[in-house]
Design a protein with these regions (language model features):
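Primarily marks hydrophobic transmembrane alpha-helices of the MFS/SLC 12-helix fold
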Residues: 64-67, 266
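C-terminal ends and interior cores of transmembrane alpha-helices
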Residues: 72-86, 272-285
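Symmetry-related core transmembrane helices of the 12-TM Major Facilitator Superfamily/SLC fold
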Residues: 154-171, 354-372
Length: 389
């Protein structure tokens, strides 16, 4: 469990690295709002797609070995960026693609942890391992300060230090669960998706919760800079407060879902998120109130992430590996759409409001979709195990 958490934590830190560095990078390279948004969104999208690939690799060579390979690739990418420099939009996007490998750590950390625990504790186990997304807090807190002190180029080199240490710990203490793991093929993903409405529902649910978390985590430094004139360091601190709330709440969301049922927890999350983001879209009340709204928003989204993965093992017991990859991919695509969409709409409308209201509408859509199937799920799954639906 600890190895999964630590691996996930540091992977998320570097996956998110361009988010808190977006202000100094954009100033140095002369990027507009739309380009800046694309810069922070590309790692999210690439991480989403690569999760399927890394998940299949983990089934063939083991989650631990796959994690080691991925971590080495990320370290090499950051070292190369540090030595060669990042001096153009094209180079930033290339680095974003390579940092997407770190985002694919989802497909290693969660199965590595979850296979050790029975169904009634899946929400707690997945929540604790998934709390590794708190690595975004580390990036938001320290990356802007390090960029101010040493330049953003050197931040890439400095990031290699904790990654190397984490890799050593992971190699020494990570253990595979003593259970057989079926190898996934591309056909397995198609089999789960074709004619299976629940698979698509869960992908949509997670595209809202994790997509909202990752998208806002990447977009908020630029948002606070544009809306309230925060410098990179202050914007990073404000974002860190939001992300910390969501990261702490993820394991708590799993615990709450274990106790009250994942559907009840998730329904509450969607209503709260839609309300909070809808209010934030009006931009009234100044920086303090807006920051408070986003702290509460990411807190709810973090809890929603835990609730989703309390439900997934109940519905897809034997296909948990396949569904983890698909749902994780959907979450990443949702995060890409949110981060990029906010920037594009800001560039062309002069305001973040429309993007936020659209996201609030998607959250309401998640509530309506879940409300329509909750009774059926509770009746069908209630005899399948001890976990609450």
């Amino acid at each position: 469990m600890f190895a999964s958490f630590l691996y996930f934590d540091l992977s998320f830190m570097v996956w998110y690295l361009l988010g808190p560095l977006q202000v100094p990078i954009a100033q140095a390279l002369g990027l507009d709002t739309q380009q800046r948004a694309l810069m922070v969104a590309v790692p999210i999208l690439c991480g989403a797609v690569l999760r399927l690939v890394l998940g299949m690799l983990a089934d063939r060579i083991g989650a631990k070995r796959a994690g080691v390979v991925a971590q080495l690739a990320v370290i090499a990418s950051l070292f190369g960026a540090w030595q060669l420099g990042v001096h153009s939009m094209g180079q930033v996007l290339l680095l974003g693609v390579l940092l997407g490998i770190a985002g694919a750590s989802f497909a290693v950390a969660l199965p590595l942890a979850s296979r050790w625990y029975p169904p009634e504790h899946q929400g707690t186990a997945m929540g604790i391992a998934g709390a590794g997304n708190s690595g975004t807090v580390l990036a938001a807190l320290f990356a802007p300060m390090l960029a101010l002190a040493f330049g953003y180029q050197n931040v890439f080199g400095l990031a290699c230090i904790p990654l190397v240490l984490t890799l050593l710990v992971f190699v020494l203490i990570a253990r595979e669960a003593p259970i057989p793991v079926a190898r996934k093929r591309w056909a397995d993903y198609g089999r789960v998706l074709v004619g299976n409405r629940d698979a698509w529902r869960f992908m949509f649910f997670y595209s809202v919760t994790f997509g909202g978390f990752s998208g806002f985590a990447s977009a908020l430094p630029g948002y606070f800079h544009d809306q309230f004139g925060f410098d990179a360091r202050t914007a990073g601190w404000a974002t860190a407060a939001c992300v910390l709330a969501g990261s702490v709440m993820r394991p708590l969301g799993g615990v709450i879902a274990d106790r009250v049922g994942g559907t009840r927890a998730l329904l509450a999350v969607y209503l709260l998120v839609a309300t909070l983001v809808g209010i934030a879209g009006f931009g009234a009340g100044g920086a303090t109130i807006t920051l408070g709204l986003f702290v509460l928003t990411l807190l709810c989204l973090g809890g929603g992430n835990g609730a989703v993965f309390q439900l997934v093992p109940q519905r897809f017991g034997q296909d948990i590996g396949v569904m983890t990859g698909l749902i994780g991919m959907a979450g990443g695509i949702g995060g890409f759409a949110l981060a990029a969409g906010l920037g594009v709409l800001k560039q062309h409308t002069g305001s973040y409001a429309i993007g936020m209201w659209l996201f609030a509408a998607f959250a309401l859509g998640g509530w309506a979709l879940l409300a329509g199937v909750k009774t059926q799920w509770r009746s069908e799954w209630s005899t399948a195990g001890a976990a609450r639906v």
